[in-house]
């Protein structure tokens, strides 16, 4: 009797160890599969149109703590999953009667918000280099390999990057649209434009990197440019020498000193003058009688004192009164403020550029980078922005090599990591619409009608309206040193507001550089064309909710000795 009992006991002990081993193996395998699925599922999101549905894998991973919360700020999260606003402990944050704060913790709402490459339907496509077409050398002559190692680049008129599908023809077309003569490719993914060839030609073997999207085509190397001429036959290239009318302006006192180049020609036209100035890489073409002048905006000719266009009317041979001139914007970019770099030494002051999503943070970064000459960083990574020239996107956000760091975070711990911050505020009505458009159609697109008419829009407003308010309240409460900037003031009074921002960043900037920024103020991230959704998207209930938050933020700003919100924020 004892022997069978002993055997049974021995078997059960072995079974316990076996079950323990199988359980550990099961948990380890499940964790590895979860991580692998998360990595595979995120790129697949690129192929699907934007919606507000949560990613199950990302949600599970966040719940078990396997993935970094910064990589899972999913813009497509279902509103049912969005956590809500903590009860703010400060007197300034008391909720006025009638405002219903959501019931869950807002930290999850911030965590699920994502500025990641995979969140943007307009991000780089999944098509790899293998699917690209053959090289397009016939669309422009290959001029050779050139060195660009100096501080001052020769080809700097237009710059963009594409880490996944850069081709020779892609760069040529981009330069042709801006009326440049030469297109240079560097490091396999960088495109530069200009009207003058670099001075130093090197061996063809030194341009040994293939284009990221075109096997067999050389796209330069580190500090080496493969330069092509831009052919007029480029498909997709716009008409050359087009110009945009800027207005009628008084002539400066010293024309010769203010206008760098000129020509006189009978029956000179806008296109002729624009072409002449574009070839010389000037952003302004000025017409006065039969004379054509080329110039940059300067303190002596700042384009801020426009007069009635009738004074420059072209009804006579003299073409208007002698003291006035017509000014046109050429397709050529003002290059005096396009040079940017990382900080030479790590910054001692860690500065945030904080805003609610949709408040114009990317546009503000464009202005700051071109004004200071230093890259801005980001708490997130957005491949689309990197491809558009925001090189700081790839730098670690805590590297301190950038002039400031973009963030939409608003928790106490996240705020207190920064020594100071520029707090960018925008009208919540416009911010909500802008962010909804970005979620559904990318940085430059518009959400289709089906999204506005679905349950997604009211759920989005109910979840995000409170975040707009709590974001400002938290930064006012926990921020160590703040500069409050209103988006509307930045747009209406760009140079004075930008000058204040640059001073806050402790950078000295010339007036010419600020005027250059003003001349290039739009950048590449403004939605073009008319909004296709003309109807009022906000219901009376939505307006009541948002208006309550506006009053709360306005009072909080005043309590902290800041001016209140602009008048256009006043409840509708």
Curated annotation (Swiss-Prot):
Domain WSC per the UniProt entry, residue ranges: 139-231, 242-337
Glycoprotein is among the record's keywords: yes
TM stretches of this protein: 15-35
Pfam families: Sulfotransfer_1, WSC
Cytoplasmic compartment segments: 1-14
Region Disordered, residue ranges: 116-135
Domain of life assignment: Eukaryota
InterPro entries: P-loop_NTPase (IPR027417), Sialate-O-sulfotransferase (IPR051589), Sulfotransferase_dom (IPR000863), WSC_carb-bd (IPR002889)
Any single GO CC term annotated in Swiss-Prot or TrEMBL for this entry: Golgi membrane
Keyword match Transmembrane helix: yes
Glycosylation site positions: 105, 254, 345
PROSITE patterns to which the protein is assigned, alphabetical: WSC (PS51212)
Catalytic activity: a ganglioside GM1b + 3'-phosphoadenylyl sulfate = an 8-O-sulfo-ganglioside GM1b + adenosine 3',5'-bisphosphate + H(+)
Annotated GO MF terms: sulfotransferase activity
SUPFAM superfamilies the record matches: P-loop containing nucleoside triphosphate hydrolases
Subcellular location: Golgi apparatus membrane
Predominant localisation class: Golgi
Family designation: Belongs to the WSCD family.
Role, per record: Sialate:O-sulfotransferase which catalyzes 8-O-sulfation at the Sia-glycan level using 3'-phosphoadenosine 5'-phosphosulfate (PAPS) as a donor, forming 8-O-sulfated Sia (Sia8S)-glycans. Displays selectivity toward glycolipids such as GM1 gangliosides.
Protein name stated in the entry: Sialate:O-sulfotransferase 1
Species whose genome carries this gene: Rattus norvegicus (Rat)
């Amino acid at each position: 009797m004892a022997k069978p009992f002993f055997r049974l006991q021995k078997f059960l002990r072995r079974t316990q160890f076996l079950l323990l081993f199988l359980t550990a193996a099961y948990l380890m395998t499940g964790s590895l599969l979860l991580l692998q699925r998360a990595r595979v599922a995120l790129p697949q999101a690129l192929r699907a149109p934007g919606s507000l549905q949560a990613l199950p894998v990302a949600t599970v991973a966040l719940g078990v703590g396997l993935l970094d919360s910064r990589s899972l700020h999913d813009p497509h999260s279902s509103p049912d999953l969005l956590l809500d606003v903590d009860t703010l402990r400060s007197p300034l944050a008391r909720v006025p009667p009638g405002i219903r704060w959501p019931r869950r913790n807002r930290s999850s709402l911030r965590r699920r918000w994502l500025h990641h490459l995979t969140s943007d339907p307009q991000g780089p496509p999944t098509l790899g280099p293998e699917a690209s077409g053959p090289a397009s050398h016939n669309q422009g002559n290959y001029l050779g390999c050139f060195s660009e190692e100096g501080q001052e680049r020769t080809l700097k008129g237009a710059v963009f990057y594409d880490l996944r599908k850069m081709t020779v023809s892609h760069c040529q077309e981009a330069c042709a649209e801006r009326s440049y003569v030469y297109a240079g490719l560097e490091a396999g993914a960088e495109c530069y434009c200009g009207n003058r060839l670099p001075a130093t030609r090197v061996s063809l073997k030194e341009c040994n990197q293939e284009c990221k999207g075109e096997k067999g085509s050389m796209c330069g190397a580190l500090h080496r440019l493969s330069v092509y001429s831009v052919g007029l036959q480029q498909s997709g290239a716009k008409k050359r020498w087009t110009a945009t009318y800027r207005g009628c302006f008084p002539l400066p006192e010293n024309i010769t000193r203010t206008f760098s180049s000129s020509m006189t020609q009978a029956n000179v036209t806008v296109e002729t003058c624009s072409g002449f100035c574009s070839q010389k890489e000037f952003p302004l073409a000025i017409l006065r009688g039969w004379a054509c002048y080329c110039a940059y905006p300067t303190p002596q000719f700042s384009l801020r004192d426009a007069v009635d266009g009738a004074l420059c009317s072209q009804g006579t041979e003299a073409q208007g009164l002698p003291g006035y001139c017509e000014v046109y914007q050429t397709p050529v970019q003002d290059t005096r403020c396009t040079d940017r770099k990382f900080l030479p030494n790590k910054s001692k002051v860690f500065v945030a550029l904080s805003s609610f999503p949709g408040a114009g943070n990317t546009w503000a970064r464009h202005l700051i980078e071109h004004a200071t000459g230093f890259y801005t960083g980001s708490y997130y990574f957005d491949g689309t922005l990197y491809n558009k020239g925001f090189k700081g996107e790839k730098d670690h956000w805590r590297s301190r090599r950038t002039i400031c760091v973009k963030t939409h975070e608003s928790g106490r711990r996240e705020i207190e990591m920064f020594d100071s911050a520029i707090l960018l505020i925008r009208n919540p009505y416009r911010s909500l619409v802008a962010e909804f458009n970005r979620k559904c159609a990318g940085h430059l697109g518009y959400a289709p009608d089906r999204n506005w008419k679905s349950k997604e829009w009211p759920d989005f407003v109910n979840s995000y309206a409170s975040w707009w308010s709590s974001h400002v309240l938290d930064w006012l409460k926990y921020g160590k040193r703040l500069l409050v900037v209103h988006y509307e003031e930045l747009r209406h009074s760009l140079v004075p507001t930008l000058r204040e921002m640059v001073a806050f960043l402790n950078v000295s900037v010339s007036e010419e550089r600020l005027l250059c920024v003003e001349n290039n103020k739009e950048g590449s991230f403004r939605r073009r064309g008319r909004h296709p959704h003309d109807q009022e998207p906000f219901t009376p209930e939505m307006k009541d909710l948002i208006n309550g938050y506006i009053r709360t933020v306005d009072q909080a700003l005043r309590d902290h000795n800041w001016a209140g919100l602009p008048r256009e924020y006043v409840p509708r």
